[in-house]
Design a protein with these regions (language model features):
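Glycine-rich phosphate-binding active-site loops on the catalytic face of alpha/beta enzymes
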Residues: 67-82, 245-257, 296-314, 344-378
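Bateman/CBS regulatory modules and CBS-like beta-alpha motifs in cytosolic regions of diverse proteins
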Residues: 30-44, 51-53, 82-120, 127-129, ...
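Active-site-adjacent beta->alpha loops and helix N-cap segments on the catalytic face
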Residues: 30, 79-88, 146-150, 194-214, ...
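Catalytic cores of alpha/beta
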Residues: 60-63, 234-243, 282-300, 340, ...
């Protein structure tokens, strides 16, 4: 008999194969803290990230994710300029003070103002001279009844009795000034009357409406973006950094390669302050390799996604629960966060992933059906769905994700070897409704386990391995479901 012990490296488990064991608890679900690490130096207020997929995350999803306390990762199936523009859109969507507001020169025309307002979803634009000195402001009210697109902006802007405030004005004082003058935008100027920023009443209001929004030190929403491993990786990173991105993900199907680390080192050497996440991996060796190379976080998941066919096409993969367990153990004490990417089907899988050692989870299919996703809306047999596809599908690869699967040199579409499919998911309404259920399930799981915060759940969570009968017992059984729950379907 041929020895084979060294060929079988272990048993692989999925989230369905285990359950968290309840423990003594002195804490209620509403009392737990779910703040966690996204990278070495970036924290997020909920441990949920939206995937860098072209039917999941563009600027609208990234804005909504940050407002709910998480973060969105903009996909890279677009030009460098388009991706950088989406980063800017997120950074300008909400801010304590907009430090780099959209402006127009004195030579601008009405058509320019209309285009900017539509492009950036804003209602007012400061007008400055070539030295940056404030000369006026044009708002949507100034343009509402203006039909001459070629009219100079200086003829319609407000230039007299401008309400301004000095650099350093607090949000509380700014709110008072806005209310006193019954205006919506406060122009911030320096001692030389140069425009230094803009505070809007809408942004002040959002601070109270979304108290756990994930923001940078300037009060802007945080956003991440994906880059690839081809020749434009550094150029793409440069454009994203200039646009204000908080972190980038070197996004490939197999992160444990020499080429990926080469890109990581190039990006790090050019932008030493930029947080760089690397994925995807599934083993302890890969985790240590990337951490030693300077990765600020690693992303775990080879083939667990609902639209991924890597495991059946290539015969390669690692059941997700075991992969997270192994990678987290290898990186314990290193300060490198673990992102569990894929395989999350129910809210209960989130506390399982975290107890296995993940710092946060990345979601694709569970978010693809929300209103904020860029996927196409479909009506099928009287029900509303949204399109959802893997980045390894032929359709996505044609749009630019070939390099993720190391097929960027293949120009003939018929010769691509896809590792994903195209499908649809039920429409789920606005993102905040889904996030509420995800967070609620996580809090409930932490309460059952007596974990006051994410680190405690990671350190003390224990599991029991269950059988197929145990899986069946876990789901509703011996009954016909007559009304759908907001957080459960089979």
């Amino acid at each position: 008999m041929i020895a084979h012990q060294n060929k079988i490296v272990g048993e692989g488990l999925t989230y369905d194969d285990v359950l968290l064991v309840p423990a003594y608890s002195e804490i209620l679900p509403r009392e737990v803290s779910i703040q966690t690490k996204f990278t070495r130096n970036i924290s997020i207020n909920i441990p949920i990230i939206s995937a860098a997929m072209d039917t999941v995350t563009e600027s609208r999803m990234a804005i909504a994710m940050a407002q709910e306390g998480g973060i969105g990762v903009l996909h890279k199936n677009m030009t460098i300029d388009e991706q950088a523009q989406k980063v800017r859109k997120v950074k300008r969507a909400e801010s304590g003070m907009i430090i780099d507001p959209v402006t127009l020169p004195l030579t601008a025309k009405v058509i320019d103002a209309n285009q900017y307002m539509k492009e950036y979803s804003i209602g007012g634009i400061p007008i400055v001279d070539d030295k940056g000195t404030l000369k006026g402001i044009v708002t949507n009210r100034d343009l509402r009844f203006e039909h001459d697109n070629d009219r100079p902006i200086v003829e319609v802007m407000t230039s007299e009795n401008l309400v301004t405030a000095a650099v350093g004005t607090s949000l509380k004082d700014a709110e008072t000034i806005l209310q006193q003058h019954k205006i919506e935008k406060l122009l911030i100027v320096d001692d030389n009357y140069k425009l230094a920023g803009l505070i809007t009443f809408r942004d002040i209001t959002k601070v109270t409406q979304k108290p756990i929004a994930n923001k940078d030190k300037y009060g802007r929403l945080r956003v991440a973006a994906a880059i690839g491993v081809t020749g434009d990786a550094v150029d793409r990173a440069a454009a994203l950094v200039k646009a204000g991105v908080d972190a980038v993900i070197i996004d490939t199907a197999h992160g444990h390669t020499k080429g990926v680390v080469s890109v990581l080192k190039d990006v790090k050497s050019n932008f030493p302050k930029l947080e760089v996440i690397v994925g995807n991996i599934a083993t302890a060796e890969a985790a240590k390799y990337l951490a030693d190379a300077g990765a600020d976080a690693v992303k775990v998941g080879i083939g667990p996604g609902s639209i991924c066919t890597t495991r059946v096409v290539a015969g390669v993969g690692f059941p997700q629960f075991s992969a997270v367990l192994e990678v987290a153990a290898a990186l314990k004490g290193s300060g490198v966060p673990v992102i569990a990417d894929g395989g999350i089907r129910y809210t209960g899988d989130i506390p399982k992933a975290i107890a296995a050692g993940a710092d946060c989870v990345m979601l694709g299919s569970l978010l693809a059906g929300t209103q904020e996703s860029p996927g196409e809306t479909i009506i099928y047999e009287g029900r509303k769905f949204k399109s959802y596809r893997g980045m390894g599908s032929v359709e996505a690869m044609k749009q630019g994700s070939k390099d993720r699967y190391f097929q960027d040199v293949e120009d003939d579409i018929k010769k691509l070897v896809p590792e994903g499919i195209v499908g649809r998911v039920p429409y789920k309404g606005e993102l905040y409704e889904s996030i509420h259920q995800f967070v609620g399930g996580l809090r409930a799981g932490m309460g059952y386990c007596g974990a006051k915060d994410i680190e405690t759940l990671k350190a003390t969570g224990k599991f029991v391995k269950i059988t197929a009968s145990g899986i069946g017992e876990s789901h509703p059984h011996n009954v016909t479901i007559t009304k759908e729950a907001p957080n459960y379907s089979r």
